[in-house]
């Protein structure tokens, strides 16, 4: 026998008065004895808190503040705790001998709300030796201990091997563990279940009859028949769904044509517009691409024209600039020619003037010579006259002196005086103060030498004077020539400059002689330089045209390469037309082939669509017509096999349905007639009595009763013997067993149980051996199990039958589709894909177009290359002869060098031309420049000074000589000699004076005549000089003008200037002709550019419009495509065969479908509005929305339980397959599902009878319970009168109310509610719906009234109410009821829990002193009989001889409050044993 679980102990940690206290609980009754405030209620509160840790329920009334409102947070728990961590733990051992410690950690929460934090936990696998207090406390010393926190407890337990610690976040999980381990009797799944459990504990704790429990005894004692209720609900739901499905089938059948019509027209309407937009989008894209290609081509042409225009404009600009420069050069050349001609005329004038000047120069020179000679003669005459005058004066002076001397005494004294005078004059003249007559001789030699020197110098000066006098006029002429050539200069420099000019003149004449050769060489070099420049220009132009720079060495190779290229390009250009013609012919052939394929493509696409549908339907790929015909034969064979299998599955399904119907009979009667016979005989079916047999026991009882398991148990067989006569409506074998149906057991047989079998000894000579059936059906659990397996099998069979039926129909339709395909499309379906061929041909056409464009481009490029090569060869033909010129890099330098030499030579020629005559005249007279004509006066002064010096020297020598001569006169003088000498001298002087005067007269006459002649000559010279100066000034002006003209007026200058002008004129003419050509070409290019620009603007406008249209359409198209893909309708709308229809044909098709759709959706407001919106041509997505709306509308009208698809098109196909079959099947299903009102009444009655029997069994346990005047307690269960009437009507008079139960608009629950209202019109149903009322009427508990009755004294049986009973009687009665509830819970929960667990039973009773000793003894007896633990509390010991008693005394020690506990076990013959650990006081210590 399974042992019942027990609570071993209760541990309180840190509660008020209990620091660490463990109460060992007795197996029966534990008594808490003590005065008021001793801690009895606190201990019980700790137990209840650990049992139900739900703060929303805990409410300890005796400690709640008096007058507290419901808003108070404190429900009596906060004040029972101390600050810090608190624990309440229950140590239990279950039926499996597993020790389980469950409990809660409590902690006061700071604040005014007096909240308590609770954390439930459980400990499993704890060794028996470990006490609970050891787990949660830590001993610090002998007098102190500390309470561990929950985390520390967890860590401590984790260190213990085999111990499991669980902390729970929800109370449901906590109670679930306690239920599974057998600590509580009922699984508390919800707050409502916890509330019931707490109300039970509360009623037990506070005693008395709980009104909360007695009012809801049905909820506590009667189990909810959820299986029956769920069966009714499932049945109703199935019926409702069945009816809705049948109605949907009928509606769908009526709307099938509308489906087809609506889908067909909607598809045509939307697909035509969809494909038209797709075609238009493709056309627009093609047009946009064509526009873009043409735009790019035009842009390239415009860019080429622009480049060409830029090149021509640049070239024109160059030519314009060159023309300007050429015009300027031409004008300059013309002006230069004019200047040269002017210069030549000027040169002629200059030459005439120079000739005149030369003539005047000659005459002027001649006249100058004449004047010079006249001046010289005049000077000579003047000198002669002056000399004559001087001589006359000197002679007169001498004559006077001598005359005077003649008058003095010619004495020696005079001589002496004269000697002295001579000596003094000698001293004075010779500046010799120390001169003596003796030294006079010496000084005389000296002064004579000086005189000789002075005389020589004077002679030299005389010679110079003579030369100067003769060259005076020549010097002036030579100086004038030098000044005219060199410009103003110092006269002292004239000789050196003249010599330099003569030397330079020789060089200049040499250079001037080279002018003509140099000019010819320069002309030749300039011509070559111009040719070189022209060649360089041609080379630069050639390189520019070729786009590459070439070296001179590469030109010949390039010329050969270009000639070879011309030869090859000429062949390519000549063959290009043939290639173009071949490409165009191939293009035309491709176009005709594409047109043919486009006509054939729709037919092929229709065949492919049909073939694809067949492939999708059958899951096969067909590659030839032979495979199609072979598959058709396979379909026929498959159809035959499927039909055979469908019939087999249908037969098996019907058999399962019959078995389910048979097992579903009320009471387990497999034959419906047995129920009627049982009611007729007043008995009960044996299957009903054993209806509660568990699934494990079902095989045993099924084998025990064998064939008699369908027997009827009757109270008395003799009373029904007469009824058996003439009984025909019954099974072949009817078993009747005599016995009390309320207390029937299996004692009527003698049974031996074997291994999976029994031997039943029916009689001494008749045994029956029955094996346990593998599939028992005895008892409700076995039947439900079998029915459940049959239902599962039936579901599989139904699904298989439906699948096979659908496959048969599908195969038949597939056969028809194959037949249609073979008749219509087989001939074209397996031909090559025309669209692939079209794509290939289009690709080839694009390649041809590209090849043509490339060919045209290449041809044009080749022509351009050909022209460029020809131009390059032409340019090279002009360049190659001038390669030497191009290679001659020194030509310009040589030209510059020759130019410089020519300039020097021309400068020399101009110099010679200008000064040649002067140099020729200067050369013979250059020597006269050695003496400056302006130094003649100086020379004369020098001569006069030399003469004076010679005279002074002569006088000094004469004085010295006179002194030397008169040395004798110093002594004496011969006076006779002196007198005779003086007379001779005087005579001579007179003669000479006369001669001198005559000479003076002649000199004066000659001077006057020569002066007149000199004046005449001077006048002629002045006139010549004036004419010469005028001519010279004019010549200088002409030379300046010639210099200002700045040209060389040589003999070839005019020819060169004219040739240069003609060359520039030719270049200018060529430039102007080229410019005119360029202007014309530029005008044509501008016109072409303007045309291209207009075309480009138009193309850009068209392209942008088209692109904007494409982009706009793309945005709409993207929305359309997104909508199409999101809704999965692309396959329906993208009908490729429509792509080959024109826009008008598609628009016509869409318009026709639109007209049909307007009529089709006229009655549907939503579709009508969507269709009206979809007619907007600018919003193509609205047509998709309409199509989706149509599909959605059709999907909503498709029942998924009927048709296994969301696609209305497939739904239409499946409709035709499924509708007829489903109609049949659902009709039969409804007939099978429909339950009769009689069956419902029988089920409810049987359930009521079963529960009444169970309550009677519970009452048997309460018969011996007595409390005070209460002798017995029982539960009375009665059927309500209104509900009994309802059951009678359902079972007997259901025909009168078939209008309710046969109505398709009402469910069975609603019909039952309507019937209840019809039978009880006086009852107000309130706001409840018929469905709710009907569901309540299907619950058997609502048919019963349950109340507690007590047999009290002389009053007999009366209703148990607290007012009619004493306090002790009420407590005992309430406790009895609670024990009954606990037992009922255990019976109800037995199926949910393991069979090897018997849960703990424990109740509370506070203030048990209100019971007398007899009542207490009754409680003890009840606990012993029911194996129940009880915790009671009373001020005094109630029954210390039984159970365990704890004496609690609250004491205060040193301001510390604690409870002193003493525990005693019940009295026995031996001395009472003190419980361990209860003799010492519980002295709490402060936690360190």
From Swiss-Prot:
> Where does the record place it?
Cytoplasm, Nucleoid
On whether Cell cycle is a keyword of this UniProt record, the answer is yes
UniProt-listed Pfam families: MukB, MukB_hinge, SbcC_Walker_B
Which UniProt keyword terms apply here? ATP-binding, Cell cycle, Cell division, Chromosome partition, Coiled coil, Cytoplasm, DNA condensation, DNA-binding, Nucleotide-binding
Q: Which residues form a coiled coil?
A: 326-418, 444-472, 509-602, 835-923, 977-1116, 1209-1265
Some GO term, biological process aspect, for this entry: which one? DNA replication
User: Where is the stretch described as Flexible hinge?
Assistant: 666-783
A molecular function annotated in GO for this UniProt entry is: DNA binding
InterPro entries according to UniProt: MukB, MukB/SMC, MukB_hinge, MukB_hinge_sf, MukB_N_dom, P-loop_NTPase
Q: Where is the composition biased (Basic and acidic residues)?
A: 1051-1065
- Has the keyword Cytoplasm been applied to this entry? yes
Q: How does it assemble?
A: Homodimerization via its hinge domain. Binds to DNA via its C-terminal region. Interacts, and probably forms a ternary complex, with MukE and MukF via its C-terminal region. The complex formation is stimulated by calcium or magnesium. Interacts with tubulin-related protein FtsZ.
Biological role: Plays a central role in chromosome condensation, segregation and cell cycle progression. Functions as a homodimer, which is essential for chromosome partition. Involved in negative DNA supercoiling in vivo, and by this means organize and compact chromosomes. May achieve or facilitate chromosome segregation by condensation DNA from both sides of a centrally located replisome during cell division.
Against NCBIfam families, the record matches this protein to: PRK04863.1
Protein name, entry field: Chromosome partition protein MukB
